Amino acid sequence: MQIELLKFQNDVKAKGLKVLILIEGRDAAGKGGAIKRLIEHLNPRGCRIVALEKPSDVEKTQWYFQCYIAHLPSAGEIVIFDRSWYNRAGVEPVMGFCTPQQHKDFFLREVPLFENMISNSDIIFFKFYFSVSKDEQKKCFEKRRSDPLKQYKLSSVDQKSQELWDKYTLAKYSMLLASNTPTCPWTIISSDDKKKARLNLLRFILSKVEYPKKTGDFSKIDVKLVCSGEEEIRKMEANLEKFDSKKADEKIKDLD
């Protein structure tokens, strides 16, 4: 599949196409490893990874999406966001880094409009959410704590992820409801098995694009590990219905 990805990149450059890939998910979902595998053999001159730091004091005064616009792909480019504007749909509201109004009244209302503008700008747009279970996340955190070479990956925010699991689940549900649209849909990839998740990512992308001398059938996606945003919403709602809506914040089930 790496050869096929390189063929696709060559076609992107030759035709002046623009490709944008968002990789989202909880902490320890395997986002970084998947991106590393995705770009492993791509030409770095035509491929960029965007992983922005927390906003500066100046950026905090700007339109929320402004800092991301400068990083969108130009003709011939593939751009991969390692987390994106969806920080405001997950970690920011859960950790109190933004107000409820900034989250619900602005972001969740505006993000479909913003992404429609991206889609209407002839950008090939993918949105992936890597879904890790609570138990697997806990195991990953324990490995990071015990491995000096991985301890840098464990932040104070990460360490609260288990405690705030249910709130992150509700935030994910709100995000999918607001931003899973026909023009910019989500694809959910189960990532407890990191190797399979990476392979499914590559396979899914290749199944959705065409380029000269394409070889191989990539249409057989593992439906046990990959689903649409719409399917994920249905799964989450089936679990949510088991709980009194007034107590959902406290008693929601492990939905990932």
Task: List the predicted regions and their residue ranges.
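Glycine-rich phosphate-binding loop of ATP-dependent small-molecule kinases
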Residues: 1-256
